[in-house]
A protein has these predicted regions:
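N-terminal, polar/charged subdomain of small-to-medium soluble alpha/beta proteins
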Residues: 1-122
């Protein structure tokens, strides 16, 4: 049986945050880039915002979670996904990646990143 799948996403959301395992990272902070993608079966194509994922809400979730200092980026991603599926229970799949620009390590590293995905058991 064929069905439509819809994607609503944010790419390259730039944030400054205090995430990091080392105490100095939580003092100095760093620049981060977030990508957030949701996928779901659309309920209808009737031009109603209530029947889709509002990317403004996704941005609010990302901005709010980036303000909550965490040691591990994985924790930030898990919190973002949890809020997305709580707000939009019809979402089948969520993927979030979080890049830390210029991570504090020897050498020249453009960014490190962590990616986490959730798939509904529906």
């Amino acid at each position: 049986m064929s069905q439509f799948k819809q994607t609503v996403a944010l790419k390259d959301v730039k944030c400054f945050a205090l995430h990091g395992y080392y105490p100095e990272e939580q003092l100095i902070g760093n620049h981060f880039v977030v990508d957030l993608e949701t996928e779901f079966t659309p309920q209808a194509f009737d031009d109603q915002l209530a029947k889709t994922v509002n990317y403004e809400h996704l941005n609010t979730i990302v901005q709010d979670e980036m303000k909550n200092t965490q040691k591990l980026l994985e924790t930030v991603l898990n919190n973002i996904i949890s809020k997305v599926i709580a707000l939009y229970p019809f979402v089948d799949h969520v993927t979030v990646s979080l890049k830390k620009l210029n991570p504090p390590m020897p050498g020249q590293v453009g960014h490190s990143f962590v990616k986490l995905s959730y798939t509904s058991a529906k």
